[in-house]
Amino acid sequence: MFKQLSTSLLIVSACVFSACTPAVKQEIAILPTPVSLTEQSGAFVFKDEMKIGVSDQSLFPAVGYLQEILRNVVSSSVEVTADKNQVDVYFQLGNTDGKPGSYKLQSTPEFIQVEANDYSGIISAITTIRQLLPAEIEIQGVKQTYSIPAVQIEDAPRFEWRGFMLDASRHFWNKDEVKHVLDLMSLYKLNKFHWHLTDDQGWRIEIEKYPLLTEKGAWRKFNTHDRTCMARAIEEDNTDFLIPENKIRIVEGDTLYGGYYTHDDIKEIVAYAAQRGIDVIPEVDMPGHFLAAISQYPDLACDGLIGWGETFSSPICPGKDATLEFCRNVFKEVFELFPYEYVHMGGDEVEKNNWKKCPRCQKRIRTEKLSSVEELQAWFVRDMEKFFQANGKKLVGWDEVVKDGLSSDAAITWWRSWAKEALPTATAQKQKVIACPNEYFYFDYAQDQNSVKKILAFDPYADDRLSQEQKEYIWGVQANLWAEWIPTMKRIEYLIVPRMIALSEIAWAEPAAKPGLDEFYRQLVPQFKRMDIMRVNYRIPDLQGFYKVNAFIDDATVNLTCPLPGTEIRYTTDGSMPTRKSSLYNGSLKIKETTDFAFRTFRPDGSPSDVARTRYVKAPYAEAVTAPASLQPGLKAVWHNFRGNLCVDIDAAPVRGEYVVESVSIPEEVKGDIGLVITGYLEVPADGIYTFALLSDDGSTLMLDGELLGDNDGAHSPVEIIVQKALKAGLHPMEVRYFDCNGGVLQMELVNDKGEKTVLPKEWLKHE
C-alpha cells in the first residue's frame, strides 16, 4: 500500500487505535492557518493493525506523542515493520528546503506521509493531524471509526520563535499544570517556553548549593495578591480565584503558600517539552526582582538596604564580589538542567537608588571607570554575558538591557510598548529580538472586545524604521502571562484561550494568509468544541449588541448576540451577579426606562463567563451651552506630577506643565509620572446620539456636560470603554482625566453607526 517509499524503516513497537462505527466527516478548520491546503477525495481511516514507520530513530518520541494524542480511542498493539508495502503512516526526515518547523503532509485513503527537515516539522505535522481529526478523539472510550480527509498540505512558520512565558513565581504551577500549558502550546504550534522561575514573591528552582532558596524562599505568607484573589472569588462568584489547598502548608502555626521544582522535576518537564518540539528557556531574573533570594541571603544586597524602594524591590549589590559569585553559581546549576543554548537573565525594572548610597557600588563604578549607576547595571549585564558565553550559553534579557553593550549573540525580549527604540536599536546591533509588547501580548491583562483583533493586527515588520536587514533579526513573537492575580490553572486557561490561538496565527501564518476577524472567530468554533471536550476553561467571546453606556430618548431594544453557539445568556437588573437561575435572555428586550443590566454567558456544562455590565440611559438631548466670548482651537491639558491610582486625586499633585492638544492624547513632552486633566468644549454639528470610545492604560474618566459619562478609572492595563450620550448641536463642556502607572496609552475616538472609529474631528475641540 505505500509503494513509493524508498527509505528503510526502523522496526519499533507502537500502539494504534480503532473503533467500530461509521467514520465522522468534519469541516477542515486548522489553526494556525496552513500555507497551502488542498482537499482531495476520500479519507484515511485510523484502524486496527495500523503500521507506523520513521526514517530515523530520533523520531521515536514524535511517534510516542502521536500515540498520546490518539490515546482516548480503543487501541491494540501492533508491530511496525520495515516492509514498505505494509506501512500506513510514515514520518521522514529529509531536506525539504524549508524553514525550521516546515513540513509536507499527504493523506490518501491508503496512507499518510509526512516529510520535514527537522524534528519540529514532524511535530507540526502531528499537530495538524490532530486538528484534522474530530474533536471527539479527546473523549475517553468513544466508539467510532476516526478518519482524516485526504489532503495535500505544505506548511511553514513565518517566525522561528513562537513563544509563551509563564510566571511561576507570583503563583506556583506544579508539574502537571506546566505540562498542561505545554500541551496547549503544542496544539497550536508554539515552540518556545519561557519559564519565569524567580522573582520577589517566590524562588521556584532548586539550587543545591544554596538550599535556603527553596527551603524558605519558595514559601510565603499570603500577600496582597493572594488576598485580592480570594476577595474576587467571593465578589465575582468565581472559584477560579481561590488559592489551591495543595499549594498551602502549615509551618509552626503559619499558613504558607508556595512550591518549587526539584532537579528531577525540571528534567522531566524539559523532556516532556522536547517531545512536543518545544525548547525551554529558564529565566532567573537579576539584578532586580531578586528579593526572594535576598531575604534568605541578605549579604547579596547592599549593606542595610533591603526591602522595597519607591517602585521596585532592592536589587543585589554588584559591588560585592561574593554577590557576583553567587549569581554565577546559580547559573551553573541552571545551565546543567536546561539544554537549550539560550537562558534569560531578566534585567528589567531595577531600582538603582541603593547603588548611589552603597560604598561598594561606588567603588565598583570608580574601579571599572564607569560614570553612573546606569552604567553599573550595564557592566553587570556584560559581566554575566561573558560568564554565559564561557559556559556555552547565550544571554536573553528584557529590553531594558538593549543599550548595555551586549554582543550580537544576545537576544532582546521587547516588552515595553512605550520603549519605541528597543526594536530598531537591537536589530541595528544585529541582536535577535522577541517581540512581546505588553499592549498586545500581556495575557494577564483584562480582555475586551478588541483583544483578539489587536493581536491579529500586530506585525513587527510594520515598523518603517527597520531596514530589510534589520527585519531579519526579528526572531518572532511571544505572549507573557504574569501571575500576580492568577492562582489557578482554570484562570490561566480563561486568560490565554483564545488569545493563544490568535498569537499562533500571527506567529505562523503570513499576513496575506491570515483570516479576517469574523472568519477567525468562525474557525474558532470547532476549536472551542475541542476545548469543551478537553474541559479547557476558555473565554467565551464577548457578547455583542451594546456599549458600556447606551443612550436612548423614548425606548430602546436590547439585541444581544454571542459568537459562540450553544450558550445561554442570563441577566439581572438589580446589580446582583447573574447565575443559572437568573432571567434567561431569549430574544429582544424592550425597555422604556433607565436600566442597569448584568449579563453572563454560560456554556452547556454550566461554567460561566465574566460578567458584562452595561447601562441604558433614557434622557433627552443635552442642551448646548452659550459660547464664551473667545474660544481657541484644541483642548487645554494640564500635566501633574502624579503617582496615584484614582483620577479624582490628580489635582492635589504639583503642576509640571500646560499644553494645548489637538486630540485627547498624551502630549509628546509628558513623561514619567503622569496625571493629566484635559478640559475644553466639544462642539457637535447636529442633534443626535453620539458614541465615544475611551482607551487608556492606566485610568481615565470622561465628563460631558458636568456629568460622569465614562468611568475607566483605576490602575489597569489597556482597557477601552464605549459610551453614548444624546447631545443637541453646539458646545458641550468636557473634561478627560488620566493617569499612568506604567503603560502610557490615552485615546478618545468617535464611533459611527457601523462601529468604525475615527479620531475626534479637530474642529469639534475648543478651549478658553
Name each model-derived stretch.
Residues 1-29:
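Bacterial Sec-dependent N-terminal signal peptides
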Residues 98-324, 330-342, 383, 387, ...:
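Feature activates predominantly on carbohydrate-active enzymes
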Residues 293, 298-299, 304-409, 416-425:
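Active-site neighborhood of glycoside hydrolase catalytic domains
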Residues 601, 736-738:
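Conserved structural position at the C-terminal beta-strand
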